From Swiss-Prot:
Catalyzes the interconversion of methylthioribose-1-phosphate (MTR-1-P) into methylthioribulose-1-phosphate (MTRu-1-P). It comes from Komagataella phaffii (strain GS115 / ATCC 20864). It comes from the Eukaryota. This is Methylthioribose-1-phosphate isomerase. NCBIfam families: eIF-2B_rel, PRK05720.1, salvage_mtnA. The gene is MRI1.
Length: 411
């Protein structure tokens, strides 16, 4: 990708994040100087994706420590002359940061790890150095792990397709790519890795054979992902940039699309005739029994997949997303988002020829449009929980996991 979602300058201890609310209309970076800034960009979803949230949260703590460790700034009760008071103030600030997005476990895990560093630090300088080191390693490890997730996902898919020949399609929801992580992505990382393998011996995607491969990825279906439209704004941006063949669909189209492809319905024009063989999603939290919390709409995709023997449902996430403190999905706190996020939409203004309208600086004019009846009741959960019985595989950087003979994941 030409765009980095997260930029951290270690020499200057400076963090800048790409404002993802403006993509694909504008490219704008926001400086995150402290925990308040980190809370704001996470809560407003200017940065999103469980791994990215954890990384930005960790770096925001690092930046705040850098500004207070030498007494340059003394807000929020920091006292550089008293280590115990300093630590207590920092722990209170970290607890505040955790509340920005309660469902994503990666942020909680990262903050918990940093609090352990706080507890054992002997000096403020040592504390800063260790938090900086932890944050940088978190960022670097996430990128390495994403490539491993991609490779493990391809291994699982190859095994499942051992008796299948020809082109196939996959479906995904939300955005789980470079914009949601340090790079490559989780679920979208698997799709990237699949596409890299499929185009190794380029042919027409609908040819009967590709040299050396019995089956190959030929098409991706990206769900729009209402109400924040991460699929239409972000995933479509990434797929388009990498020239991976894809079609954008609304969140209420998957059942009819999959059924039409399986039945080869001739009276229904389709972007590709390759059947959907896998639905690949990310996760904001996976609990001990394998239940998976992800973007709202994921559960219904798993239900659809369960109706077709030939469609496998895959959850992809690093092991940092696994929450061993909760036994089942019933224990997951589901974040509720503001009503106006469902009843209005932000987009780029277009003219009569469907071209973007720009200002004198060449920036696309952004407009917020009301799309619903005013003053109505709204239910707007950000996530849902997919029960483990509907999940065929959980792919991590360590391996791909399938259920044992008792129908359980051994996480």
């Amino acid at each position: 990708m030409s765009l980095q979602a997260i930029k951290f300058d270690r020499q200057k201890t400076r963090l800048d994040i790409l404002d993802q609310l403006l993509i694909p209309y504008q490219t704008k970076y926001i400086q995150v100087s402290n925990i308040d800034d980190g809370y704001s960009v996470i809560q407003k979803m200017q940065v999103r994706g469980a791994p990215a949230i954890a990384i930005v949260g960790s770096f925001s703590i690092t930046c705040e420590l850098n500004s207070v460790k030498d007494g340059q700034k003394n807000n929020h009760g920091y006292d550089v002359s008293d280590l115990s008071v300093f630590k207590a103030a920092l722990e209170k600030r970290i607890d505040y940061l955790i509340k920005s997005r309660p469902t994503a476990v990666n942020l909680v895990n990262a903050c918990t790890a940093i609090k352990a560093i706080v507890e054992t630090a002997c000096t403020i300088d040592d504390l800063y150095a260790e938090v900086l080191r932890y944050s940088v390693v978190l960022f670097e490890d996430d990128l390495k792990n994403n490539y491993r997730i991609g490779a493990n996902g391809v291994r699982y898919i190859d095994n499942e397709l051992s008796n299948f020949e020809g082109p196939f399609a996959v479906m995904t929801i939300c955005n789980t790519g470079s914009l949601a992580t340090s790079g490559h992505g989780t679920a979208l990382g698997i799709i990237r890795s699949l596409w890299a393998k499929s185009k190794a011996n380029p042919r027409n995607a609908d040819d009967k054979t590709i040299q050396g491969q019995k089956s190959w990825l030929s098409h991706v279906y990206a769900c729009e992902t209402r109400p924040y439209n991460q699929g239409s704004r972000l995933t479509s941006y990434e797929l388009n940039f990498e020239k991976i063949p894809f079609s954008l669909i609304t969140d209420n189209m998957p059942a009819y699309l999959i059924d039409s492809l399986f039945s080869q319905r001739v009276n229904c024009p389709l972007p590709s005739r390759a059947p959907v063989k896998f639905i690949i999603v990310g996760a904001d939290r996976i609990v001990t029994n394998g239940d998976l919390a992800n973007k709202i709409g994921t559960f219904q995709l798993a239900l659809i997949a369960s109706q077709y023997d030939g469609v496998k449902f895959i959850g992809a996430a690093p092991t940092t997303t696994i929450d061993y403190t909760r036994d089942s999905g019933d224990d997951i706190v589901i974040e509720q988002r503001p009503a106006n996020e469902l009843t209005s939409i932000l987009g780029g203004q277009v003219d009569s020829s469907d071209q973007f309208v720009t200002d004198s600086e060449g920036k696309v004019n952004l407009l917020r449009i009301k799309t619903a009846t005013p003053n109505i009741d709204v239910w707007n959960p950000a996530f849902d929980v997919t029960p483990n019985r509907l999940i065929d595989s959980i792919v991590t950087e360590q391996d791909y996991l399938v259920k044992d003979s008792h129908g359980k994941f051994n996480l």
